[in-house]
Amino acid sequence: QSHISKARRPYIL
């Protein structure tokens, strides 16, 4: 619950 919240853009961890 910090980087990818509610599918906000495709983040690459």
Swiss-Prot record:
Residues annotated with Pyrrolidone carboxylic acid modification: 1
GO cellular component, one term: extracellular region
Biological process annotations from GO: blood vessel diameter maintenance
Tissue expression remark: Identified in brain, intestine, and rectum, but not in stomach or skin.
Subcellular location: Secreted
Superkingdom of source: Eukaryota
Keyword Cell wall biogenesis/degradation appears in the UniProt entry: no
Principal location listed in the UniProt entry: secreted
Keyword Heme: no
Function field: Smooth muscle-contracting peptide.
The family this protein is said to belong to: Belongs to the neurotensin family.
Protein name as catalogued: Neurotensin
Organism in which the protein naturally occurs: Rana temporaria
Lineage: Eukaryota, Metazoa, Chordata, Craniata, Vertebrata
